[in-house]
Amino acid sequence: MDRKIAVSGELGSGKTVLCRKLALALNMEIVSVGSIQRQLAEKYGMSTLEFNKYMETHPELDRECDNMVTLYGKEPRSLILDSRMAWYFVPDAFKLHLLVDSRIAAERIFGDRDRKNETYASVQETSLHLTARKQSEALRFKQQYGVDIDDARNYNLLIDTSHLSPEAVFNKVMEPLQEYLGKQPGD
């Protein structure tokens, strides 16, 4: 049986870490639209924020990514979709949304040295870029699809990760996820 899990959330909320933990626990592959977009930004010689701004006037790039998510959602295999809009393009997925305090998000991202094309001089600069990027994405999704990505009704489960360890977030997700997938704990 193919299952889809749509993991979305705010920048710095821990989506990538959670996706990795879920992939290991459930033996599922991850498709990360954020990674695809970061690669495209690098290809175009832009920061992620610059690329998001660029996509505001070049919706064909968003559509390209969105079409990929839709196609992955139709594949006959189980997948974890790490994407802000997978909940919209894969309606049968378990839709999980992670929240985080903006200051904590900035601290997490500033301290993440794996983000090679997202380097900042300070937590404050990181915070400014995150705010601009969040606004850019919300605007694009509202203009292109008429949706509010912050509307809690879009999701099966919301978790505020601000004061939780990655393990605690994983544990909060597993019970409702297993119930949704029709699995019993311990299977």
Predicted regions and their residues:
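P-loop (Walker A) phosphate-binding loop of NTP-binding proteins
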Residues: E10
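ATP-dependent small-molecule kinase phosphotransfer cores
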Residues: V31-V90, R103-E107, G111-E118, Q124, ...
